[in-house]
Amino acid sequence: KYGCINVHASLLPKYRGAGPIQWAVINGEKESGVTTMYMCREIDKGDMLLKDTVTLDPKETGDSLHDKLSMMGGPLLLKTIDQLEDGSAVRIPQCEEESTYAPKLEKTMGNIDWTMDADRIERLVRGLNSWPGTFTKIHGKTVKIWDCDVVCQETLTESQAAATPGTV
């Protein structure tokens, strides 16, 4: 009678796909949320029903955002079911022009490219925490990176400030 309903961990139509939580952090989004939607044959393209939004903390990680969104999803699903039962649910088609895709995460994504700017690296470390995680190679050994901070140029010593980006 109603079809299948899904709780998706993004504010659709942004971040359709398997990695919406992590990509929101990696891309520096200021907010995220959950969306209830009708399922269809195409991934995350069904009509939307309800959304709930959360502001991302400046040090938000993939894990911390996952935990926040998981706490929001259940109550939103219950509200959606109530609206479906009483006939007040409204189907909202997704705008294709606003859609983005959040691809599946791969372990290789965590290999830090030290030529990226510092802000991008910091968001990557936060977004991929704790899985798949980030890492680098130092003297042939793999080193996991769990946290990092971007420092202001003014706080560096003269030799640190003169170092090539990516110097560890």
Where do the PLM segments sit?
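Donor/substrate-binding cores of folate-linked one-carbon enzymes
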Residues: K1-Y101
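Internal anion-binding site segments
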Residues: E96-V168
